[in-house]
UniProtKB/Swiss-Prot annotation:
Oligomer and partners: Monomer.
Cell compartments where the protein resides: Cytoplasm
Source lineage: Bacteria, Pseudomonadati, Pseudomonadota, Gammaproteobacteria, Alteromonadales
Gene: gltX
Protein name: Glutamate--tRNA ligase
Binding residues annotated for ATP, in chain numbering: 238
Cofactor comment: Binds 1 zinc ion per subunit.
Species whose genome carries this gene: Idiomarina loihiensis (strain ATCC BAA-735 / DSM 15497 / L2-TR)
Catalytic activity: tRNA(Glu) + L-glutamate + ATP = L-glutamyl-tRNA(Glu) + AMP + diphosphate
Motif ('KMSKS' region): 235-239
Length: 468
């Protein structure tokens, strides 16, 4: 039997971290077995479902590299099929019309809660054909004896007594089918063999299994993934940082790091931390996913992100860095190749957003220096080293790191001063701040005439400081 998994988000918001992990696990199960991964948009909630949310989900999936083999399917395009099967259940007396008013149901629930009972439908219309009215819902006739048992890949054997389950509404008063019914029909029609989803769906599972059996459909295998917590042990929310997948793109994370991190968020393979996508496909097993909730650790994600920025081919990272520069309005058409910037800066930052922020001097002119760095290093004592450095740097005919370093060394030797007396003022002059990679390779990526002009700007700053 070919394995078919699915990811079935509701388009009522962005693709959040928990949903992305579920999608990844489903994708890995399919790819490991040479099966198919189906994308289904569960948009029956017409009031809350939006096209921007659908677009955000698709964008998030594409950014993570979770390509789907079939779909996206939309539940709102399948209402005829749902109605066909609802009619079938009605004809076979496996479903019935319920005319109970909202007032009656509310009163019933209040009385049940007052008596310390779990609120549930009391079956008033189940076997009462004389009840009538203009408005009705359709309820599934749930079995009243026996139990539903399924072996969850993550949680083991789970059993629900049918007496705990009331008769589920499968069609609303306006005729639209409900979530639990649509899911069942879709999983059947799309040949889904493995359902991977959040633990909040565990209570839906016995109801869905009963409907599947009533329809004569095969029952898929289930795996319910635990929730993701913040580092304080509470449910992950915006106060813990980004929860939208695309927010991580915006914040400068590479998709390889996010995929690696999400895979490890509740799953492990020995003590290995770094996984290529091929390794994830090879090693991932649902049975190895933890039952316990996982805590989101931003520091761990940052560590992974820096690892991937340093180890991925620079040409693969460069377009993502370009996107970050675009967001802050930096024109990179005049300046070094972004691959060079990536190689130079990757071990100095945790995100591409930080990399773009500290690399503006490669592409933009500036007329001010970092206040703290200038105060410390652009003092009158720095005037002579800067003048000498400008002279020797200006004499270079082949502008490269080796010749630049030789000029810096010669400046220090000619003035009989330590390298710091030359290097730090020159760094502030050339980059505008006190932090940069090694000065020789940094200056190599800045045009020679630009470096000389910036030294003049620094000398002017020192002169103004002396005259102040």
């Amino acid at each position: 039997m070919s394995v078919v998994t699915r990811f079935a988000p509701s388009p009522t918001g962005y693709l959040h971290v928990g949903g992305a992990r579920t999608a990844l696990y489903s994708w890995l199960v399919a790819k490991a077995q040479g099966g198919e991964f189906v994308l289904r948009i569960e948009d029956t909630d017409r009031e809350r479902s939006t096209q921007p949310a659908i677009d955000a989900i698709l964008e998030g999936m594409e950014w993570l590299g979770l390509s789907w083999d079939r779909g996206p399917y939309y539940q709102t395009q399948r209402f005829e099929r749902y109605q066909e099967l609802i009619d079938k259940l009605l004809e076979e007396d496996k479903a019935y019309k319920c005319y109970c008013s909202t007032e009656r149901l509310e009163k019933m629930r209040e009385e049940q809660m007052a008596a310390g009972e779990k609120p549930r439908y009391d079956g008033h219309c189940r076997d009462n054909p004389n009840v009538g009215g203009d408005k009705y819902v359709i309820r599934f006739r749930n079995p009243q004896d026996g139990s539903v048992v399924f072996d969850d890949h993550i949680r083991g054997r789970i059993e629900f007594a049918n007496t705990e389950l009331d008769d589920l509404i499968i069609a609303r008063t306006d005729g639209t089918p409900t979530y639990n019914f649509c899911v069942v029909v879709d999983d059947w029609d799309m040949d889904i063999t493995h359902v991977v989803r959040g633990e909040d769906h565990i209570n839906n599972t016995p109801r869905q299994i009963n409907i599947l059996k009533a329809l004569g459909a095969p029952v898929p295998q289930y795996a319910h993934v635990s929730m993701i917590l913040g580092d304080d042990g509470k449910k992950l929310s915006k106060r813990h940082g980004a929860v939208s997948v695309m927010q991580y793109r915006d914040d400068g994370y590479v998709p390889e790091a996010v995929v690696n991190y999400l895979a490890r968020l509740g799953w492990s393979h020995g003590d290995q931390e770094i996984f290529s996508r091929d390794e994830l496909v090879e090693y991932f097993k649902l049975d190895d996913v933890n039952k316990a909730a996982s805590a989101f650790n931003t520091e761990k994600l940052n560590w992974l992100n820096q690892h991937y920025m340093k180890t991925l081919p620079a040409e693969q990272v460069a377009p993502q860095l370009q996107w970050q520069f675009d967001q802050i309005g930096v024109d990179t058409s005049n300046g070094p190749a972004l691959e060079q910037v990536v190689s130079l800066q990757a071990d100095r930052v945790k995100t591409l957003k930080e990399m773009a922020a500290i690399s503006r001097y490669f592409f933009e002119s500036f007329d001010e220096f970092d206040e703290k760095a200038a105060k410390k290093h652009l003092r009158p004592v720095a005037k002579e080293p800067l003048v000498k450095a400008k002279e020797l740097l200006g004499a270079i005919s082949d502008w490269n790191a080796a010749n630049i370093q030789a000029a810096i060394n010669q400046t220090a030797a000619d003035l009989d001063v330590g390298m710091g007396k030359v290097g730090m003022p020159l760094r502030v002059a050339a980059t505008g701040g006190g932090n940069s990679p090694s000065l020789d390779v940094t200056l190599e990526l800045i045009p020679q005439q630009t470096v000389l002009a910036r030294i003049d700007l620094a000398l002017e700053f020192i002169a103004n400081r002396e005259n102040a």
